[in-house]
Amino acid sequence: MKPLVALVGRPNVGKSTLFNRLSRSKSAITDSTPGVTRDRHIASAEWQGRKFMVMDTGGYCHDKDSLNRAMMEQTLAAIAEADVILFMVDVRSGLAYLDLDMSRMLKKNFRDKPVYLVVNKVETRQLAFEGEEFRRTGLTEPWFISAREGNGVADLLDEVVASFPDETTEEEDTAIKLAIIGRPNVGKSSFVNALLGTNRHIVSDIPGTTRDAIDSRLKRNGKEVLLIDTAGLRKRTKIDRGIEFYSSVRTDKSIERCDVALLLIDAEQGLEKQDIKIIQMAAEKRKGIVILVNKWDLIEKETNTSKQYSDRIYDQIGNLSWIPVLFISALTKKNLYRAIDTALETGQNRQKKISTSELNRFLQQVLSELPPSTKSGRELKIKYVTQIGAHYPVFAFFCNNPDLVLSNYKRFLEKRLRQTFDFTGVPVSFRYRKK
């Protein structure tokens, strides 16, 4: 297990800027608005050949607002999980009451963990002199850095990695990556929390309370699963601040990163245009897709309610009807593990390899069932087929003239191939080549 380093402190002291520098990414949203990072998220980092995990947190505060209270609870949970704590303060705003309060809390409750007092935004000697006041916290010698410029970060990291326990050999990460996607407030974080059995994500009725992508792990039937819970995709016209826009970009990137996308929709709202855009985006990126109709416990049901609901969805998504639809409730935990099992099966379908001999037996069968016709009356000969895709199913059909293959015959071949080899939940690509 990689050591976990938690970045903690009051809002807007530069935690996300340091997180981005350590993880060499823009995974965390940075902004001058206090509380921009409202949840925990984790990324891989490496220094001097030593790998570790770094965790960003929302911020330590005493605000009575329910959302800030939840953010505070998440910060305390992050400290409890961490192996090393970087307690960050802001030299430009000076020593604050919250800094003193948090230092007392750390000294009282986490004596067994290495805690580093990190004075951030120190870009000049004068600021370093002013930073001496943070010695009043009674913690270790302060480390003066500029997360933005990189000053002092190398020396800090040398000390941090030296505090790690002896390194152990780690196995290659073979976890299947599942992106939990959907519009705001459809229950994505509640779904993840119900699976993990812990309040890993802030859950609130306020749309958009998860603005970043968050990674969590679980095991299912001996298989490692990485859950990527993303910010909801809003209609572009509703994104009126840079923060929300950047979060929607993060969702795009989460889809890019995953093996299978789990699209959650609200049972009472149904499938909307933005959901269809998300599905199309995932399909274009050749990802596995599963639609999860959440809050099914709120729907009054008759004998054929679920079938009628599924039929409406399939009418809306048209030629993407190979996507499975499941009905779940994050609140009552109905079908949650069935959803994960379906996602795992979809992931296996995405990696499925069919031998050339099997494919050509299939081809001869379908050609005998329905020989291809052409508009011009010219003869079309499909000679053989083979699988060529490395990361998702791609099949090359070799024929005398690819231009003669009609679109309806292409649909027929795809339908029969899916029926024969089961590619449920997975986009399948066909290439027609001249031979």
UniProtKB/Swiss-Prot annotation:
GO molecular-function term, one example from the UniProt record: GTP binding
Keywords for this protein: GTP-binding, Nucleotide-binding, Repeat, Ribosome biogenesis
Family: Belongs to the TRAFAC class TrmE-Era-EngA-EngB-Septin-like GTPase superfamily. EngA (Der) GTPase family.
Database matches in CDD domains: EngA1, EngA2
InterPro entries: G_ENGA (IPR031166), GTP-bd (IPR006073), GTPase_Der (IPR016484), KH_dom-like (IPR032859), KH_dom-like_a/b (IPR015946), P-loop_NTPase (IPR027417), Small_GTP-bd (IPR005225)
Residues involved in GTP 2 binding: 182-189, 229-233, 294-297
Top-rank lineage group of the source organism: Bacteria
Protein name, UniProt field: GTPase Der
Domain EngA-type G: residue ranges: 3-168, 176-351
Binding site for GTP 1: 9-16, 56-60, 120-123
Pfam family, one: KH_dom-like
Domain KH-like: 352-435
NCBIfam families (alphabetical): GTPase_EngA (TIGR03594), small_GTP (TIGR00231)
